[in-house]
Swiss-Prot record:
Membrane-topology annotation of the record: Multi-pass membrane protein
Family: Belongs to the UPF0060 family.
Cellular localization per UniProt: Cell membrane
Protein name: UPF0060 membrane protein DSY4157
Listed GO CC annotations: plasma membrane
PANTHER family registered for this protein in UniProt: UPF0060 MEMBRANE PROTEIN YNFA
Keywords (A to Z) from UniProt: Cell membrane, Membrane, Transmembrane, Transmembrane helix
Transmembrane segments: 6-26, 31-51, 60-80, 86-106
Length: 108
């Protein structure tokens, strides 16, 4: 369970961080190498989920989506300085509950 959480967090940071660098390059006129570095990081984002032990691609990516939402809220708060409101936190918590059910519900 700890390894799964670490891999989800690493994937999220790679996706958000890489995407953010591409955003800065294209939307905020940063140097082209922001985009290059962002693209390289996004390749790692594509690789990291394959290290998960769960057998189903769909389940891994669906569960990762919930983790991504939480990380995106935290990124917006920490990096973009946009304070999440109560509904952001409630929505993120609901997603985390969904991830937990999807990955660790007892199955036969």
């Amino acid at each position: 369970m700890v390894q799964a959480a670490i891999l989800f967090i690493l994937a999220g940071l790679a996706e958000i961080g890489g995407g953010y660098l591409v955003w800065l390059w294209l939307r905020e006129a940063r140097p082209y190498w922001y985009g290059v570095i962002g693209a390289i990081i996004l390749v790692f984002y594509g690789i990291i989920p394959t290290l998960q032990k769960f057998p189903s691609f769909g389940r891994v990516y669906a569960a990762y989506g919930g983790v991504f939402i939480i990380l995106a809220v935290l990124w917006g708060w920490g990096v973009d300085k946009k304070m999440p409101d109560t509904y952001d936190w409630i929505g993120a918590a609901i997603c985390l509950v969904g991830v937990t059910v999807m990955l660790w519900a007892p199955r036969q």
